[in-house]
């Protein structure tokens, strides 16, 4: 078996981004993905800071801009829909709550998939079921495909990573809940958002949000609530929807119409929010990337940047190490650890700031939002938004330059 065959588990953003740079470094890449095909749609993600630089080096920025969702900024509203605070998209140099470039997760994943498809093997509708390492390689068993051996296996399969569970240990050892649950889905409605990402808070730590999609009448909606860990079946969509409906039954603004839309949404997603912390992102010939190794939660707005930068650095270090995977993985950790540590610091107020429990807490949070562009509050949030670019991207030779697609 050649020593340059690498398996990536996960075809979201981190996995294909890693495949792109690995192929430029001369590696043979296979990606396995549980879904039967690339997943379309999803919520909007930010291209900011160093993550945007990686997309530029891949030659994909023009296409990303063409696919981006035009949003005027972020707005808070009360029960009657009256605006209580606004933050335009050009605040903080286009690096605020709504960044200069917002793109649907599925659209960004598709761009990366198309950029890697010609020279990357994809195994859809499959997953890893076993990992057995020896001194020379990793033997991987799959749910459908025949067993194969790889020089390296990378888990880029999200916070509930199968690879991490097989090679590192149970999820409870690494995923740290922040006592916040969220659901996202796409609605088609004539709700007039006027181009704004709109959020409404209700007492009890309840949040309703809606933002424009890319298509006319398309709304990316969400419900979030604070709660200690709940016992729920991640596969039982009906039970999850009923849980959300009960929590938000008496919430105002547009919650009732969005709850109705939730019942028929084809892309309903529900999960707890938690951060992933590991002392090391590798175990022998198995490594973790993106949310699988260092999920920061959506509250930080840095998950996409962490995935893109992590992919660039991991591939670059593997190419630079000349086959010494242990050296490459140590260097990957050295370069990424400070960036990840900064990114995983939640914004001021954390979950309580995002979803205040009381009416007074909501009013105080709205006041801080209205003051966000003024000193001294501006400095607090500017430091949070600046984290996206708080890493010096190494140059890894010709492969770092990318190519126009």
Please name every model-derived segment:
Residues 5, 28, 218:
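Residues at the starts of beta-strands that form the adenosine-phosphate
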Residues 1-4, 24, 66, 81, ...:
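C-terminal helical "tail/cap" subdomain of flavin- and related membrane-associated enzymes
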Residues 66-67, 121, 250-266, 325-330:
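Acidic/histidine metal-binding catalytic segments
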Residues 62, 189-195, 230-231, 254, ...:
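Short helix-loop capping/hinge motifs at secondary-structure junctions, enriched
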Residues 185, 196-230, 248:
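Active-site substrate-recognition segment that forms the wall
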Residues 7-24, 30-36, 154-155, 183, ...:
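Conserved mid-domain beta->alpha element of the FAD-binding
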Residues 175-180, 194-197, 236, 253-270:
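A short coil-to-beta-strand element that immediately follows conserved catalytic motifs
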Residues 2-6, 23-25, 48-184, 228-245, ...:
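Conserved N-terminal helical subregion
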């Amino acid at each position: 078996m050649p020593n340059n065959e690498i398996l990536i588990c996960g075809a979201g953003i981190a996995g294909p981004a890693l495949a792109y740079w690995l192929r430029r470094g001369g590696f043979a890449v296979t990606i396995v993905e549980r879904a039967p095909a690339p997943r379309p749609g999803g919520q909007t993600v930010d291209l900011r800071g160093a993550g945007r630089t990686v997309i530029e080096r891949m030659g994909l920025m023009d296409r990303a801009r063409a696919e981006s969702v035009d949003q005027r900024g972020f707005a808070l509203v009360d029960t009657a829909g009256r605006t209580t605070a606004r933050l335009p998209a050009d605040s903080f140099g286009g690096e605020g709550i709504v960044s200069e470039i917002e793109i649907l997760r599925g659209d960004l994943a598709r761009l990366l998939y198309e950029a890697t498809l010609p020279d990357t093997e994809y195994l859809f509708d499959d997953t890893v079921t076993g990992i057995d390492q020896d001194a020379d390689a990793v033997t991987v068993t799959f749910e459908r495909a025949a067993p194969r051996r790889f020089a390296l296996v990378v888990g880029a399969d999200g916070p509930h990573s199968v690879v991490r569970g097989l090679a590192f240990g149970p999820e409870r050892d690494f995923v740290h809940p922040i006592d916040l649950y969220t659901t996202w889905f796409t609605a088609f409605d004539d709700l007039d958002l006027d181009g704004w990402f709109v959020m409404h808070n209700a007492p009890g730590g309840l949040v309703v949000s809606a933002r424009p999609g890319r298509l006319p009448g398309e709304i990316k909606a969400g419900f979030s609530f604070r709660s200690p860990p709940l016992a729920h079946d991640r596969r039982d969509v009906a039970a999850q929807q009923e849980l959300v409906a009960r929590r938000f039954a008496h919430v105002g603004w547009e919650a009732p119409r969005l709850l109705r839309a939730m019942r028929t949404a084809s892309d309903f997603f529900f999960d707890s929010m938690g951060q992933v912390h590991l002392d090391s992102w590798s175990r022998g010939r198995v490594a973790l990337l993106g949310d699988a190794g260092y999920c920061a939660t959506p509250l930080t707005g840095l998950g996409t940047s962490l995935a893109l930068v992590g992919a660039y650095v991991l591939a670059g270090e593997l190419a630079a190490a000349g086959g010494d995977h242990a050296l490459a993985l140590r260097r990957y950790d050295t370069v990424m650890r400070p960036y990840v540590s900064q990114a995983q610091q939640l914004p001021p107020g954390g979950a309580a700031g995002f979803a205040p429990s009381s009416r007074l807490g909501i009013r105080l949070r709205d006041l801080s939002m209205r003051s966000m562009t003024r000193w001294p509050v501006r400095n607090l949030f500017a430091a949070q938004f600046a984290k996206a670019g708080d890493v010096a991207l190494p140059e890894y030779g010709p492969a770092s330059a990318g190519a126009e697609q």
